[in-house]
Amino acid sequence: MNDPYKAFCDDFYVNLRLGSQLNLPHSRETLLHFFERVQKEFPNMTRFRKADNGDLNLEEDRGNHSYRWAAIEAKRLAAGHVNPASIEEALKLHKLMMQLAPYHLGISPVEIDYLDILFGFDLAFTGNHDEIISESMFGSSPLNCLAEEGGARAVDFQPTVTVALTEDCRLQARIDVVTRTNSYQVRTGDYSEDVISVYLILRRYWGDHPKEPMENMIEEMATRADELCSSHIIPRILRPISNAIASRS
């Protein structure tokens, strides 16, 4: 599963999210011990910070093209690898997080709500993001009918689609397209360089309390996500968006 996405985006990342129905522990000793254990495996993760909302983050230097990060939120454990050399490389941190969670944070399968694997793609563009999505994603769709009105300008085209991949609906896949221009920019033509983001999220709900180790599930979900990207996301979403951006350069 080598990274095949460089030709279609400026940044690619693989994120992990483990949601709990209970608050995660936030005692000083527990948190420091957990982050020290992560740092032992990834010595370049040296930047520790606490956000205003109480979230705790340990990360590598974001100034580098490729970097890792890990976070403990109120009810969620999260991690990410931006521009990994391969999918396998990104999963090293994620598997470690799942191995440590039960023993260092006391996370029990009983409390788990969901497990997410997110493949993210950022495409830089200075201009009307929503216009790009309107043209590349909607085209002749009936949902694009308002764009046919005289003087109409796209200001909010952010589609999201979710499907169940299993009969019990516990494994679901979602596509989110996120734009970052606003009405002021459309009105004035004063655009700043920002990114259009495309997310493919595989979510495994935990109601049946699966017995398989979480690190194995992560690898299976990442493999499925990679297959979905090859068969659907690249040819039907990333390539049309990239072509629309290139047509304006």
Briefly describe each language-model feature range.
Residues I72-C145:
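Internal, hydrophobic cores of structured domains that mediate oligomerization or house catalytic pockets
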Residues M1-A74, A78-G80, I245-S247:
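N-terminal low-complexity, intrinsically disordered segments
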Residues L115-D190, Y199:
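Aromatic/basic-lined ligand-recognition segments
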Residues F8-L18, R68-N83, E111-G120, D194-Y205:
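Glycine-rich, often proline-containing surface loops adjacent to acidic residues and nearby aromatics
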